[in-house]
Amino acid sequence: MKKIVAIFLVFLGSLWAEDPVIDVVNSGVVLPKIIVKDNSNLSDENLKKSFYNIIVNDLKVSSNFEVVANATETSNYTFEYTLNKNGNTLSLNVKIKAGGSDKSEQTYTLNGLEQYPFLAHKSVKASVNALGLAPVDWMDHKILIARNSSSKKSQIIMADYTLTYQKVIVDGGLNLFPKWGNKEQTLFYYTAYDHDKPTLYRYDLNTNKASKILSSGGMVVASDVSVDGSKLLVTMAPKDQPDVYLYDLNTKNLTQLTNYSGIDVNGNFIGSDDSKVVFVSDRLGYPNIFMQDLNSNSAEQVVFHGRNNSAVSTYKDFLVYSSREPNQAGVFNIYLMSINSDYIRQLTANGKNLFPRFSSDGGSIVFIKYLGAQSALGVIRVNANKTFYFPLRVGKIQSIDW
């Protein structure tokens, strides 16, 4: 069990954020300039400042604009907005101008003051789409984080990608490995203990209720969900021997996919039709990534780089993984590759870069970075070749999902 824990609980970090602060690397492309104009007349100065900061940061992270403070509206884009607050309700009007001419106007309403970061994210996402620029549909998606709250206890929280919004969803006991269950993000799976037995639960955010899916001795973790949401890839160890299983939520049928005397964990669907699975195995004597068809028990090595590849996430034919660098003590970098090509792209350069997760459109990757005594949530904009960092503080991270 110690080896199992070593693979799943790779490293612990810290979590908390005030107004998001962006650090950007790999910049240099000339982008169109955009001015942000806040016409709000709010008495809540903290909300006013925080909302403005999020809008500015979202525009930067979109990698479509260079945000400028002093420029003429007649020759640049303008993001002009008015935010109003009425009790616990927010209303937002956004006008996008190009060269002084209106390009789009949208009005939004949000019931739930604490969720204001998502209102900002949604408005930037819609504005980018209205201008026909590279989409950022992932921007208003939620992140699930399991974090240690005390000895042998952990919480599952839901957050926006800047970590400005955080809400505890599951508390009490040991709650681990949250995994979104559908693209609408209305439910997720997680592992907890029922009378000291590892149990997989499904949590419905519409009803705020958890239901039991299945239990297993040793461990049970949902590592991936099929595109249609009907099947789970589950790591189970009923005889203290972790293997990857396929669980059909409709038929309740459980199929063992791997059968190796060592460790097979963290299965992820890969391919456009979810017909293959990649997983982490120690069958070479160290953690590495393998692949096999769902209807076959023959596994093939996928990654031929590094000697400790213990985290993986997939999008269609692509996979992203964290790899320990040889001859660099404690350094883990994130790499991107396709199962249809030998090309490997290094995405990070130093420190410990862990928990990589693809966005819903595959164009971005979120991860946790540790560098010395500092830690941050990183967002890699793959096509723009940019990485943005948001500071993390307080609370140890056990796992994340996006």
UniProtKB/Swiss-Prot annotation:
List, alphabetically, the Gene3D superfamilies matched.
Answer: TolB, C-terminal domain (2.120.10.30)
Q: Please list which residues make up the signal peptide.
A: 1-17
Gene Ontology biological process terms in this record: cell division; protein import
Gene Ontology cellular component annotations, sorted alphabetically:
periplasmic space
The keyword Plastid is assigned to this record: no
- Recite the UniProt keywords alphabetically: Cell cycle, Cell division, Periplasm, Signal
> InterPro entries from the entry?
6-blade_b-propeller_TolB-like (IPR011042), Tol-Pal_TolB (IPR014167)
Q: Where in the cell is it found?
A: Periplasm
On assembly, the entry states: The Tol-Pal system is composed of five core proteins: the inner membrane proteins TolA, TolQ and TolR, the periplasmic protein TolB and the outer membrane protein Pal. They form a network linking the inner and outer membranes and the peptidoglycan layer.
Record's function text: Part of the Tol-Pal system, which plays a role in outer membrane invagination during cell division and is important for maintaining outer membrane integrity.
Its family remark reads: Belongs to the TolB family.
The record's listing under PANTHER family reads: PROTEIN TOLB, PROTEIN TOLB HOMOLOG
Specify the protein name: Tol-Pal system protein TolB
Q: Which organism is it from?
A: Campylobacter jejuni (strain RM1221)
Q: Which gene encodes it?
A: tolB
